[in-house]
Amino acid sequence: MFNLSFGFFGVQIAYALQSANISRIFATLGADPHTLSFFWILPPLMGMLVQPLIGKYSDRTWCRLGRRKPYLLIGAIVAVLVMIFLPNAGSLNLSSALFLGLSGAMWFGLFSLIFLDTSINVAMQPFKMMVGDMVNEEQKATAYSIQSFLCNAGSLVGYVFPYLFTWIGISNIAPEGVIPDSVIYSFYCGAAILIICVLYTFFMVKEMPPKEYAEFHGIEPQKAERGGQESGLFKLLFKAPSTFWTVGLVQFFCWAAFLYMWTYSNGAIAANVWGTTDVASEGYQAAGNWVGIVFAVQAVGSILWALVIPRFKNLKTAYILSLLIGAAGFVSIFFIHGQYLLFVSYFLIG
């Protein structure tokens, strides 16, 4: 079960680097801080498009490399290439070329972000699906727990990379419009870990052929080859219970809040704590590193609160309390001007 999910560790590092640094990268390239949200539309949009497609087509893919593994490998390779090119967008002498008000560097970054988020989704989804494919019902909880642990561990590593590289002496400032070396090397290191972890899972895990898969799940071989799914997406949504829609509505607003956090944390912390909005300044880039640290604190808070929730007799009470605590964390960011006090805000969000 560990081998099945180990690649997820590398994928999550890539995802954490994207979450913590995309606003910083585009602001450094010259994007207006007030329009950063337009760039951030792309990751959830790609997720909405790619995740159902990967599920649909990997259900029907049976080849000598496996069922889910071909998508996993292709997604990882593309993600690695993009992670090498994206942080160098400001170093390619494209800043002078303008189209629709955006410099060539920003267009390069924009298309790189599209490919990065698409490839991360392509690499991420097969790990979740392989647990359903290959783990029996009694062990699925354990398998998903391992995956959750690796997910959080990968997030922590990805978040702290820029701060760590700066701490060991790699430059955290650069000429205007150029991404600092601390961020560039973070993406390089993340790319290396990603491909190593994914290749480990790729070679250590052997997926079931259609006949064995059908026997394992107690379905007809023909149905297994079709993916075992008779209903389309819209039919499944139509038949979904009311609880699905209730939780979905809450999640809708939660993810809206998280998107604000990912988009504007860098600028807000730079202005409130370091007192600067100059993206080329040492203070702004230091704030960018600190974003990774507070995001890591948020991840720790999430892990610890997940251990507390089962102790509630009424889970609805736990979820309501969770939302109120998170809301308090979001509001407090505006009023805090000390970098270490931000630990409280982001811990509450977690």
Predicted segments with their positions:
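Helix-loop boundary and gating motifs at the non-cytosolic
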Residues: 1-46, 245-250, 254-279
